[in-house]
């Protein structure tokens, strides 16, 4: 489950040496009045900024040059797409041509081109994708949905006991809903060694996308230097060894438990017991499980934190959420998955939270063109990398008339172009651009949506979400800011969580006592 990652300045994929002169507007400036360097193109400017800065640069270029803008970096061509219709035409309808990858050098080196999110479109990638889809299908059965429901109840109860711990508890929840179904164990504390170790490594891995941290991503000549001469190359080698070592160590641990008969029911156990049903290689399988862990934990955590902030910033929507869950569920029990079809406002807030976060802090994963193509009269050379810019796509004026505003009503009211019926099914996140396009769309969107919707519903039923106050009773408002990395998390902010009433708190506490978590 590679949920909404980031691609930047990657080498052209499987290109030949043929050179073409016909092309779209070639961007020679990194900003108005500044020319790109000969051969280097825009690489120096892009290498000097972090992810958030690059999103801003791409948006400004698109505003200056149009919805399809081409630039070069070290001779490699890249294209910026800022309209959904163009992204769907190329990535979906012409997906057979536009589904390759050309990951940044550091990412390819560390993952050895085996991570299915960044791997080139080859037979191995197809096998891995099939394996991921099988895993997602397994999690949709009632048994695993019950695990998600229980994990959400555990988390809400923990927040009632320790309201200031929401950053850590949401992190624990994001891990535990995945580990309980995928790996066969729950994590009961944000300080669990599994979380700590994986978070430490993932933080370093996310930096491997950044050209300011790994200059070999944009300057190929640096890849030829000896490791002792360039610290970032030594870091890449260390991360590669850790990445491989941890994956195989965990695999051996699960195999041992299965052999002893003590392994808990989970997807990893199912895979090992039914190995003949999967045609992935052993190496592909361990990389696939690691990719599901990395992608499946980061996105829910990011969106849960964003949700809290938005409920403080837009209290009218918190009130609407609470009114809906009260009307549908009542006061005597917490929401469950059987209520979800009757909670369109909850689902609308989930989808709008994902949209809102994506427009301020996310880019699409680059799609690499596998063969020459012509679109809208423009010629594109094989190996060109196309970047869908969510900050523009999800604010398209025709589709999102008030795009800068957090407004879940756009999914609920017929006056908006995004409205769909029936409301027992819509809104949902299937096919939503924030999760990618075509063959490279996130295969875990359904899992991610189920993880979020049950938690949003339970939080709305149980708690009031408010700005913290100082000793004089004044609200301590903040601006929402994100990390400068791919799939960024919100930076630390304050929030005041309180039970809506004592009866609800008691119901949650009693339910938590009877949980049978793994």
Curated annotation (Swiss-Prot):
Keywords: Heme, Iron, Metal-binding, Monooxygenase, Oxidoreductase. Heme binds at residue 442. One of its GO terms (molecular function) is iron ion binding. Pfam families: p450. Pathway: Secondary metabolite biosynthesis. Its cofactor is heme. Disruption phenotype: Abolishes the production of pseurotin. Belongs to the cytochrome P450 family. PANTHER family: CYTOCHROME P450 MONOOXYGENASE ALNH-RELATED, P450, PUTATIVE (EUROFUNG)-RELATED-RELATED. This is Cytochrome P450 monooxygenase psoD. It comes from Aspergillus fumigatus (strain ATCC MYA-4609 / CBS 101355 / FGSC A1100 / Af293) (Neosartorya fumigata).
């Amino acid at each position: 489950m590679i949920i909404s990652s980031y691609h930047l300045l990657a080498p052209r994929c499987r290109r030949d040496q043929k050179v073409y002169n016909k092309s779209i507007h070639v961007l020679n400036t990194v900003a108005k009045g500044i020319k790109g360097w000969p051969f280097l193109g825009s690489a120096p400017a892009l290498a000097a900024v972090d992810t958030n800065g690059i999103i801003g640069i791409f948006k400004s270029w698109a505003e200056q040059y149009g919805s399809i803008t081409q630039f070069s970096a070290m001779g490699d061509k890249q294209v910026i797409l800022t309209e959904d219709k163009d992204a769907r035409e190329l990535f979906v309808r012409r997906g057979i041509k536009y589904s390759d990858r050309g990951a940044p050098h550091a990412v390819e080196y560390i993952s050895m081109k085996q991570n299915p999110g960044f791997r080139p479109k080859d037979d191995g990638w197809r096998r891995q994708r099939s394996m991921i889809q099988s895993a997602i299908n397994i999690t949709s059965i009632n048994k695993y949905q019950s695990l998600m429901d229980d994990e959400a109840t555990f988390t809400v109860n923990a927040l009632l006991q320790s309201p200031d711990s929401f950053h850590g508890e949401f992190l624990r929840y994001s891990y535990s809903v995945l580990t309980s179904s995928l790996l066969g164990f729950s994590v009961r504390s944000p300080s669990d060694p599994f979380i700590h170790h994986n978070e430490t490594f993932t933080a370093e891995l996310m930096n491997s996308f950044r050209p300011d941290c790994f200059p070999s991503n944009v300057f190929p000549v640096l890849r030829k230097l000896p490791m002792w001469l360039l610290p970032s190359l030594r870091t890449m080698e260390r991360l590669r060894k850790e990445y491989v070592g941890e994956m195989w160590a965990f695999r051996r641990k699960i195999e041992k438990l299965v052999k002893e008969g003590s392994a808990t029911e989970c997807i990893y156990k199912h895979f090992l017991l039914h190995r003949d049903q999967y045609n992935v290689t052993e190496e592909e399988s361990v990389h696939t499980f690691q990719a599901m862990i990395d992608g499946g934990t980061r996105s829910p955590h990011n969106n849960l934190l964003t949700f809290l902030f938005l409920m403080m910033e837009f209290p009218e929507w918190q009130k609407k959420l609470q009114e809906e869950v009260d009307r549908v569920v009542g006061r005597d029990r917490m929401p469950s998955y059987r209520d979800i079809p009757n909670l369109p406002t909850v689902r609308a807030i989930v989808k709008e939270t994902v949209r809102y976060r994506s427009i301020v802090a996310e880019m699409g994963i680059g799609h690499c063109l596998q063969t020459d193509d012509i679109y809208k009269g423009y010629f594109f050379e094989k190996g060109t990398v196309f970047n869908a810019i969510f900050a523009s796509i999800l604010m398209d004026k025709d589709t999102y008339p008030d795009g800068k505003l957090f407004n879940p009503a756009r999914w609920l009211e017929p006056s908006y172009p995004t409205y769909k019926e029936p409301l027992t099914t819509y809104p949902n996140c299937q096919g939503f651009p924030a999760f990618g396009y075509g063959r490279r769309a996130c295969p875990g969107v359904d899992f991610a949506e189920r993880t979020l919707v049950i938690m949003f519903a339970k939080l709305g039923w149980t708690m009031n979400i408010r700005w913290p106050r100082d000793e004089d009773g004044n609200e301590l408002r903040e601006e929402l800011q994100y990390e400068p990395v791919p799939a960024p998390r919100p930076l630390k902010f304050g929030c005041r969580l309180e039970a809506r009433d004592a009866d609800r708190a008691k119901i949650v506490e009693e339910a938590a006592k009877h949980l049978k978590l793994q």
